[in-house]
């Protein structure tokens, strides 16, 4: 079974906890009327909970994230269940639970939870990315392309790492859909001066398409020397695995269409 590290990292590095404060004053000031209007209904509902329940909820979510980072999936689910019993309308719960299902390769359940998270946190790039990624690993290329083209418009300009990765996935989706000219243009969008692995992985992808495996491996080796942090390259490498270019570390080959 192939692991999808990217979704795991995304769920933990962007946990969406910004929607609620981690600490609550003993005597919180009454929110201004404009602040109330800016809150989503589920956010306001959370703030209406007793302080002790809010603290317990946040404690459970933080513990779930900690356990998830350690790949302790069933313990993560147990903590999420604690949080769910306190407050059900939380995108954090569904986003992280969906990521747990991804680790278990239960894609239908993952997609269902990610969609629930998206309903509660509109236009959140990390959640929308997760939906696109489920379509990507299940080979639903048009749906994946549609989602990633939406995500690229939502990613903040200062989040280049995610933005470049999304563009790479768009490139690969277009290749699968027969849009070769678009894919070629995207493969040449950045050069070696770019501060991401995009250039090298795009070159490798094009080499794989030409059945030039040696050249593809050379490009990946160069990327490995330049970006020597495994955490940086992991989502790019996993993308090639899920796309079908290379074998996973589990010895399985992705199914080509």
Predicted regions mapped to residue ranges:
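Alpha-helical segment of the N-proximal tetratricopeptide repeat
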Residues: 50-89, 96-99, 103
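TPR/TPR-like (Sel1-like) alpha-helical repeat modules
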Residues: 148-156, 168-178, 185-195, 208-209, ...
């Amino acid at each position: 079974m192939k692991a999808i590290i990217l979704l795991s990292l995304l769920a933990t590095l962007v946990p969406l906890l910004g929607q609620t404060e981690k600490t609550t004053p003993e005597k919180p000031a009454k929110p201004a009327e404009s602040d109330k209007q800016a809150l989503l209904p589920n956010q306001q509902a959370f703030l209406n909970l007793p302080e002790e329940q809010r603290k317990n909820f946040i404690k459970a979510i933080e513990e779930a994230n900690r356990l998830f980072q350690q790949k302790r999936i069933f313990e993560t689910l147990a903590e999420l269940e604690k949080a769910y019993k306190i407050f059900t309308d939380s995108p954090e719960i569904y986003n992280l639970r969906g990521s747990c299902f991804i680790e278990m390769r239960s894609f239908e359940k993952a997609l269902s939870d990610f969609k629930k998270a998206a309903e509660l946190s509109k236009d959140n790039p990390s959640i929308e990315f997760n939906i696109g990624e489920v379509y990507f690993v299940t080979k639903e290329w048009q749906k994946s392309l549609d989602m990633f083209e939406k995500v690229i418009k939502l990613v903040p300009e200062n989040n280049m790492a995610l933005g470049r990765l999304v563009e790479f996935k768009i490139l690969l989706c277009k290749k699968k859909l027969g849009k070769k000219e678009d894919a070629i243009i995207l493969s040449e969008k950045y050069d070696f001066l770019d501060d991401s692995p995009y250039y090298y992985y795009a070159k490798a992808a094009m080499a794989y398409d030409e059945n030039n495996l040696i050249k593809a491996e050379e490009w990946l080796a160069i990327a490995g020397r330049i970006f020597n942090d495994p955490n940086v390259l992991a989502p790019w490498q996993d993308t090639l695995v899920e796309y079908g270019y290379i074998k996973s570390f589990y010895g399985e080959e992705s199914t080509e269409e």
